Amino acid sequence: MKKLLFATCCIAFLSASLGAAAQKKSVAKNVLTQTLNGKSWSADNGNGTFTNPLFYDEFSDPDIIRVGEDYYLAGTTMHSVPGLVILHSKDLVNWEFSSYCFDRFDDSDDFNLRNGKEAYGQGIWAPAIRYHNGKFYIFSNINGHGLQVYISDSAKGPWTHHKVNGDIYDLSVLFDEDGKIYAVHKYGNVTVTELKPDLSGPVEGSSKVVIPEGNAMGEGHHVYKINGMYYILSADYSPMGRMQCARSKSIWGPYETCVISERESYGYAAGWSVGNMGIGRPLPEDGFSFQNNKPNGLNLGCATIHQGGIVQAPDGKWWGVSMLDFNAVGRTVCLSPITWVDGWPYFGLEKNLGRSPRTWFKPNDMVKTPQAPYDRCDDFSGKTFKPVWQWNHNPNDKMWSLNKERKGWLRLHSMPAKQLLWAKNTLTQRAIGPVSYTSVKLDASRLKVGDEAGLGTINTPYASLGVVKTDKGLNLRCYDQNTNKEVWKPLAK
């Protein structure tokens, strides 16, 4: 599912004002950053139970599989690179990083923040992860570049990839028992298409709308074959985020449908929204007047769990993963017990079907010590970035260095930018809820007049806290794009 707003991130950035760039013709400035220690959220309560969400940060469009005793989870990464993240778990609660499927997007203006183009809220999204005949497959769409498939012998990579032809998007994939491969895809009109064995594209003439629009099956499909029945899970948004399930004895239908989860927000309310921003609109200039909409207490919107998939544990029990929108943190992943009633996989427990417990018993006790998927602290002494880091759009690799130009430091060279959202080589982490604290050690001694370096949150509106070099020296600048207010404070020499 494509996001209307991009996720909030914690960032380190460096930019030069356009005015300074125009005056100097060249801006090859340096900034040095180094992080300090911090902590991260874990869903494991340490007593045999867990509390949702699994990750208190953005991880949207989750899709899950099990291979033996190992679980694998794939999620959307949009415009951030490296992209298409895969996590691994033994108990569905404690997760660790496995790999990214690719390092960067192909060269283009939008993915490079070049010539006034950008890819916020675009990029790669809604992955489908599958395991078949000893290989892992990840199917996902890149805006403007169509459907891609990434293939590896291991979830740790390396991954090879090629484009899959055809008008196929927001899909799930089924490797059927008879050797045929099916894609369930599109929004509204749920469509089934048979894929060629080499995954080069669709079998000609095979596409069929199996559930017409208006039958409460929306998007973000997940397809399974269970005990001879075909099941399709979808996210629907009328009147608010919920999960639907369709089933049939044939992949081609006819299908009957059932609501399997609705109105489950774990007590959270819908957050504030911006009414005059979204996909397809220009990025807001500083001074833009944002239309901030107060949430409607009667409509939870997407603050309820909606899109996700299901998986069977080795002990025969079933579990579901889904996402819910949690204010500026983004879309968080939740784990639910699945209760089968009359052949339908309901999220939740018996006598309370469709409503998932926020705290529940872990699927197993294979992991004794609670752990978070990422180590979020970095002293930049390694040869590569820790996997928690992603670039905002493609980086310019000539304008940064890690532990090379200065040992134990990340060095960012400034490039012209109108404001934070256009700053290239911005290094990001997803913001952690419910509250985040970030510390950074920054050497600003080599900033030139017009340069700015620091931290910020990437969203619309954005906010930043940075050190600015003027002809009078260094200043601390705090800017809130929502209110268009800024505070300047001179720094002591």
Question: Can you say where each PLM-predicted feature lies in the sequence?
Answer:
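Bacterial Sec-dependent N-terminal signal peptides
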Residues: 1-25
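Carbohydrate-active catalytic/glycan-binding domains of CAZyme proteins
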Residues: 23-493
